[in-house]
Amino acid sequence: MTTIDARGLRCPMPTLKLARALRGAAAGEELTLLADDPLARVDVPHFCGEAGATLLGVEELQPTGWAFRVRA
């Protein structure tokens, strides 16, 4: 599983990093995006729907941020 650390980056950068990783991923491969920008909570699920990727889950990280599990 590939992990993309986009913590500290502001939107749209987390989504762009995910898009780049998905382009290089094999079908069915799972990726985890770490992001702490509040807009990512909205942007990433929307992007997954538009890109044909599957959002498997979102885990809230402490103290801030989220881990988005995505299947290519």
Residue ranges and their predicted role:
Residues 6-56:
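Amphipathic, hydrophobic secondary-structure cores in small proteins
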